[in-house]
Amino acid sequence: MRVKKDQIFISPSDLNNFVSCNYHALNDLNEHSKGLKKKEPSEDMKLWRRYGDEHEKKHLNILKDKYSNNITIDPTKSDDERFNSTIDAIKKGYDLIYKAYFIEGKFRGEADFIIKTKQKSDLGDYSYEVYDTKITKNLKPKHVLQVTAYSYLISKITGVLPKQMYLIDGNSEYHPNKVSEFLDYFKFTKSKFESFLSDTKDQSLYPETCNHCNYCIWQDECLKTWEADNYINQVARINKSQINKLKKEGLDTVEKFANADLKKIKAKINKATLERLHQQANLQEEKRKTGESKCDVIDQIPGQGFYKMP
């Protein structure tokens, strides 16, 4: 996401981040106004990106050998220059266009490859279909959403929706998908995202742990918020379901939970589990207030743990 003065420019990647976590999109929006800092990429992430770039370049060479009439859109140019170059290349009918760039209002994005097909369009007896490389061998719905976005943007130039779109996985296998089967979902999600961005000031949104956290560039910012608020999710080994149940009883911080009378908690949580979490919350509160680490010895249960060792 790019924010310039009062304008917000979004991409298919931003759309995927929004689907994964609304708060990611909110942090993207507030990055500069609130001085938020992105998490530095780990060595694993750097390696993953390098493999992704190599995978893309590998297929660029393969496709260039197959389609000699090809062109690369210069990614260092301005958005408008890239878009105009893409339109020009499409109208000239290049068989392969690498890094085609699309603009529809404030929605814009760059496709890995678009390849000429024999489908009739406003251009004549041809149109284009999207091919996008992914280093992963296990494709996800977000990957399909991304190529659907590019296919939609192509239709704004050609006047016709591409029939197919392709994902090239880490095994170099091609996965075709019918654009028409995913278009409505894409439009719904895009509309929802745009509505979200238009009224973020009126929304009461708080970061929650989710599957996206481990890959999120804003993870450190959320951690700072949780630590500052002493949020209930800081209790070790507590899960999302348990958090939601405790919050319904007003127990939204570690301190409130630690001070709560277990007998008055009506949440449907296994008794032993609730007692363990409560004990853990008290230990963490002790550490937070005194700076000293305390430990409780857990009662031994015959037949479990070290008792199972020969």
Stretches found by the model and what they are:
Residues K240-P310:
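N-terminal accessory regions of nucleic-acid-interacting proteins
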Residues K99-Y101, E110-K116, D125-K137, Q146, ...:
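Active-site ExK catalytic segment of metal-dependent nucleases
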Residues I217-K245:
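Extended, structured, electrostatic nucleic-acid-contact surfaces
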Residues M1, K134, N138-K142, L153-E227:
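Metal-dependent nuclease catalytic regions and adjoining charged, substrate-binding loops involved
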